[in-house]
Each structure stands twice: as structure tokens, then as C-alpha cells.
Amino acid sequence: MESLVFYQYALIALIFMWSGLVRSALGFGGVALALPFLLIIDDRPQIYLPIMAAHLLVFSSTTVITNHRLAKKGIAEPTVAWSFLGKALLIMIIPKCIGVFGLITLPTQIINTIIFTIIGLYSMTYVLNYHIESKHKFADLIFLIVGGYISGASLIGAPLIVAVFSKYVSRYQLRDTLFVLWFILVCVKMGSFVIADINLQLIHHL
């Protein structure tokens, strides 16, 4: 990112602020909305994904820990559906790792094509007012597998994953359960970045 000029840094900061507002309100969607605009500024997703991953780690962990403390004191009910979360992770973890491997090894042009294609499909569902829903157990399995892979490749698998989680997790627990899921999936991605010696852009996290 050292080659960027001031106005590009300013645009990146504004996009990250916007994605943070979306994530804090919905619990998901910040990356999917921000990544296309970031790639217009610089087309290397490996630059932005470590920073986005760090934001997810900090935001999700602080939110869940705060709510967990309230639940422990009896002020609120437990906010994480651990049982379903564990079952979903067993399905998603291998596709997730395959997606991360693809992100690290595939050419940037191919990764960008995948990202823009997926976001284009998401956009079409919005324009056509079509809600992504999983109505059968087989569809649940496919959504979690594909969502896990997309999450590994680009962190934008949330719409597919949420379609499944919203069926089995109560509305009260959904947001925090998703935050724990993002935290675990992002830890896998960041660990892979470290192993692959990818620049985590630590100075730019500030």
C-alpha cells in the first residue's frame, strides 16, 4: 500500500468506515459492500483482506465478550448458539481452507473475477427483490460448503451462510453467533496468511 497517494488512502478510510457501520448494524455484509470499491482503488485483494480480517476479529470479539459478560451476570440470556455453530463449522472448515489456498495461489485477475462475479450475483438478487433462502437440508449443506469456500477466497460468503443460520438460530442469538463464526473463520484465514508469509499490512491497520 506504500505506493498509494493521499486521496486513495482517504477513500479507503471512508470505505472502511462505511463497511464498519454496515457490519455493526447487521452483523454481516460490510466486506461484500466494501470490497468492490476497494478493488477499484487497487486491484490486489491480498492488500485489503488482512485489514478487513483484523477489523472482524476486533469487532466480533469485543461484541460477543461484552454480551457474554452480561449473560453471565444474569442481565441477558446467552447470545451464542454453540451447538449449531459447531455443526456448521464441521461442514465449512474444509471448503474454507480450500478457498484460502486459492486466494494465496491463484492469480489476482482470477480472484478478482470470482469476487466481482459473486458480488454481481448478490446485486441481482437485490435488484430482483429475491431473498436468498435455504428451504431443504440439502440446500443447507450446499450453502454452507459454497459459503465456506467463498469466505476463504474473499470473506464475502455471508449471504449464503446467513440464509442457513437464520433457519436454525433464534433471532436473538443470530447476530452474536455469526460474530463468533466470523471470528473463527477469520482466524483460519489470518493463520494461513502468516504461514504463507503474506504481508498483513500491520502498519496500515492504524
Segments predicted by a language model, with ranges:
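Membrane-helix interfacial "entry" motifs
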Residues: M1-L4, Q8, A76-V80, F84, ...
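Membrane-interface helix termini and inter-helical loops of multi-pass transporters
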Residues: M1-S3, G74, V100-I110, I132, ...
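A generic helix-loop boundary/linker signal
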Residues: L4, F28, I51, M92, ...
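Residue-level signature of transmembrane alpha-helical entry/exit and packing/kink sites
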Residues: Q8-I12, F84, A88, N112, ...
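Small-residue-rich hydrophobic segments that form or flank transmembrane alpha-helices
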Residues: Y9-S83, F143-G152, I156-L206
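Membrane-helix interface segments
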Residues: R44-P45, I110, H136-F138, S170
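Membrane helix-loop-helix hairpins that form the core translocation module of multi-pass transporters
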Residues: Q46-V127
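Alpha-helical multi-pass membrane helix bundles of inner-membrane/thylakoid proteins
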Residues: I115-T117, M124-G147
